[in-house]
Curated annotation (Swiss-Prot):
Catalyzed reactions per annotation: GTP + ATP = 2',3'-cGAMP + 2 diphosphate; GTP + ATP = pppGp(2'-5')A + diphosphate; pppGp(2'-5')A = 2',3'-cGAMP + diphosphate
Similarity-based family: Belongs to the mab-21 family.
Binding site for GTP: 204, 247-254
Protein name: Cyclic GMP-AMP synthase-like receptor
UniProt-annotated binding residues for Mg(2+): 82, 84, 204
Keyword annotations: ATP-binding, GTP-binding, Immunity, Innate immunity, Magnesium, Manganese, Metal-binding, Nucleotide-binding, Nucleotidyltransferase, Transferase
Binding annotation for ATP: 70, 82-84, 271, 274
Keyword Ribosomal protein appears in the UniProt entry: no
Cofactors required: Mg(2+); Mn(2+)
Organism: Trichogramma pretiosum
GO molecular function, one term: 2',3'-cyclic GMP-AMP synthase activity
Pfam families referenced in this protein's UniProt entry, alphabetically: Mab-21, Mab-21_C
Amino acid sequence: MVDENLYRIKKYSDDTAFSCISKHFITLKDEEIKANNQHLHNVVSQGLIPLMKEDTLFKDIYRNIKYEGSYFKGTKVAKPDEYDLNLSMKLPLNYNELQVETNHKHFSYVKIKVNSESKLPKWEEHSKILNKWLSDKNYLNQNKFHQWMEAIMTNTYKKLKKSDNFYELEVDGKNYRIKQFKKSGPAFTIFVELGDHPTLMSMDIVPCLELNDIILQGYKTFPDVSPSKCVVAKPISKEPEGEFLWRLSFYEQEKQILSNSEVSKLKVVVKMIKKLRDQLNYKPLASYYIETIFLHEIAKRKSDVDFFRASKTSLFIYMLQKLIQALEKKCIPYFWHEGHNLIGHLQPPVIENYANRLKNILLSIDKKIVDDRFAMAEFLLNEEEKKNLLEIVESSKTNGSDTQNLEKSEVIKKIKHVINDGKNKENQNSFATIVTHAIIDRKENDLERRIAFVCEELKNLGQMKEQIPLADLNKLSESFKIMFS
């Protein structure tokens, strides 16, 4: 049972380590984000979409690009080079006359029935193609829709100049090299290179159909969240009527929920849980499953401002417990319809292994965190990233941080020893304090907190007094004379 007030526990109130890990090993670089967003716009909006619009049906039903996935939700951990894009389309139909069926065993899917009364004049204009998408009972066939979109993609590629195994696309003076698209479920995956550089980015382009604000029986609604939703042509294996089942997407609503001014503070915690997942190589534990656990908690805590303003460390510990609890129950209910278990397809032994490993990690962090602020780094960072913690300190010479007078001392030398063998607990505690000291930003910490850190480090230095060379002791003495003269 998870303690619902765990986030109030004092020993988790210090965010020093959390902030360090987030800043240096999780936060995406602004320059990369800006550059890749421009490349994305060039390739898709300015390059491919105009060519697709040469097909008259596509031109008439295409609405816009919806940028999806964890990157655009603000919960992505890895390098910003993988993107999910929905090509949003709206069929020429009167949506008030559409029949959307949700009363079947696949809770995250719907069947769409197109009545003759719902067809608008534009439907008749394109009836030669559109009528082929309907079954004898007028259900919309997602497989035929997807085949049509594949033909659009193929014809678009034919309009590009081919060179070896690539297709060339020039936009705004930049020469992009695009590989032949690959089909992956509902997506068409494209790999893009710029000039002679290796793969710049990959994008999953997913065609989807808008459902507007149609109310779906049994599904959640939120008064402050847009009711607009869409469906994608995601196939279901071993299902007799699979070609008529469309997968629901509530991405826009989820993005809106996570963008709330208070709720958005949880995004970095989502990323930290994903970072742990990646470090443990738990690939079957999809990002969406983790985000869903957060969505449930957000809905439950929507009026609890204190929760969203709690320390990120305490929220990380709390949400990690929530994840463990869900894995122990072998169930992560779909946020929009809890009749669907997102991890129901995973093998029980796999889920049990994940839960047990995460419990051991949580116990270890909980045991050590009072004495070692960086206890979580042991599980969140790989060996290379752990070495980079040392570089944070050593770079103080050039970045002007508070450790610029300590980089030559014996304490800093002992940091290297701690990183190499991790055997000396006393030095580990000092290491945590030194790294903490190295990452403090003057603009983000008040005077009282800064003094507290200095006092703590002085206490550690006092315990090691006999090991500190006389020259370094003299440096400390001179520093205090200058400060208090």
